[in-house]
């Protein structure tokens, strides 16, 4: 995929933060923004314009983003309970999709996502926030350079209250 043309779905706190990140490098184009709240849609569209991109299409229904032929990639940052539904719609629409965590509520959801990938071949990624950060990438590079010797086991994590 040479030209990444993103449709952002979900522009609350986390989604807006991801949108800020996406428009900074300007390697990709944000061509659509979507949220159920019109004020968030307008704020998102204004942010994209502020960083020198064309004003994106603005939607309040994610189904409209799926129909938008200018979009080839979807970022889902909505409420958790809608992640799988929107991700599946994106995959079946042939749009690569990245979903903010949590990716699924039930095991069946996970199987549905795998099945959609197997049927469509559409790329899917969880946007886990502790995989590609500066610290994580630093440790990965240290491992690849052999600074720890042979790594036979590693564990890590963090805890925060999501209430």
Regions found by a protein language model. Give the residues of each.
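Short hydrophobic/charged patches on amphipathic alpha-helices used for structural packing
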Residues: 62-66, 140
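Conserved SAM-binding strand-loop segment of SAM-dependent methyltransferases
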Residues: 55-61
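N-terminal Rossmann-like dinucleotide-binding module
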Residues: 1-51
């Amino acid at each position: 995929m040479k030209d990444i043309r993103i449709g952002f779905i979900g522009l609350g706190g986390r989604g807006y933060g991801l949108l800020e990140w996406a428009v900074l490098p300007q390697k990709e184009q944000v061509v659509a923004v979507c949220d159920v709240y019109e004020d968030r849609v307008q704020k998102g569209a204004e942010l994209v314009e502020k960083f020198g991109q064309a004003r994106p299409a603005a939607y309040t229904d994610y189904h409209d983003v799926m129909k938008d032929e200018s979009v080839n990639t979807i970022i889902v940052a909505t409420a958790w309970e809608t992640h799988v539904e929107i991700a599946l719609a994106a995959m079946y629409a042939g749009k690569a999709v990245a979903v903010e965590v949590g990716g699924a509520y039930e095991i069946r959801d996970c199987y549905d996502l795998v099945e959609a990938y197997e049927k469509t071949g559409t790329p899917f990624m969880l946007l886990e926030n502790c995989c590609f950060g500066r610290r994580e990438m630093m440790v990965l590079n240290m491992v690849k350079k052999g600074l720890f010797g042979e790594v036979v086991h590693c564990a890590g994590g963090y805890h925060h209250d999501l209430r």
